[in-house]
Amino acid sequence: MKVLEDLYYSKDHVWVKVEGDKAYIGITDYAQDSLGDAEYIELPEVGTEFTAGDVLGVIESAKAASDVYIPVDGEVIEVNNAVAEDPSLVNSDPYGSWLVAVRLKDKAQVEKLMKAEEYKKFLET
């Protein structure tokens, strides 16, 4: 499984990339592999506010429908419509195909997520 060094990871197999007070959020290589070929992705609207642990959206595949849990508090400021229109992008490029960008409410929450090495160890358990 591919794990990128410059991202943060949740136990729900969601990655977070921080740029200032903005965070891009997507699913990991492990998550997309477990789900199989994504057929439909439901994403929130810009302006929606979330608390860490809330369901951010849903990814449906031939295997299953899976909720995507947001690991940080924030307000959606961008939605990746390309992924909604072509869900297979999360399979072919899970780390390049972010789902949403949020304005972080508490940057300290990001530091509580796993870094790449911790996430790799988590995957081994």
Curated annotation (Swiss-Prot):
User: Do you know which Gene3D superfamilies this protein is assigned to?
Assistant: 2.40.50.100
- Keywords, sorted A to Z: Lipoyl
InterPro entries attached here? 2-oxoA_DH_lipoyl-BS (IPR003016), Biotin_lipoyl (IPR000089), GCV_H (IPR002930), GCV_H/Fam206 (IPR033753), GCV_H_sub (IPR017453), Single_hybrid_motif (IPR011053)
Query: What PROSITE patterns does the database record attribute to this sequence?
Result: BIOTINYL_LIPOYL, LIPOYL
What CDD domains does UniProt report for this protein, alphabetically? GCS_H
Residues where N6-lipoyllysine occurs?
Answer: K63
Q: What detail does the entry give on cofactor binding? A: Binds 1 lipoyl cofactor covalently.
What Pfam family does this protein match (any one)?
GCV_H
Per the UniProt entry, what are the Gene Ontology biological process annotations, in alphabetical order? glycine decarboxylation via glycine cleavage system
A cellular-component GO term for this protein: cytoplasm
Q: Which residue ranges run through the membrane?
A: none
Cofactor requirement: (R)-lipoate
Where in the numbering of this chain does the Lipoyl-binding domain appear?
A: 22-103
The Swiss-Prot or TrEMBL record describes its family as follows: Belongs to the GcvH family.
User: According to its UniProt entry, what is the function of this protein?
Assistant: The glycine cleavage system catalyzes the degradation of glycine. The H protein shuttles the methylamine group of glycine from the P protein to the T protein.
Q: Which NCBIfam families match?
A: gcvH, PRK01202.1
Q: How does it assemble?
A: The glycine cleavage system is composed of four proteins: P, T, L and H.
Protein name (Swiss-Prot/TrEMBL): Glycine cleavage system H protein 1
- Gene it is expressed from: gcvH1
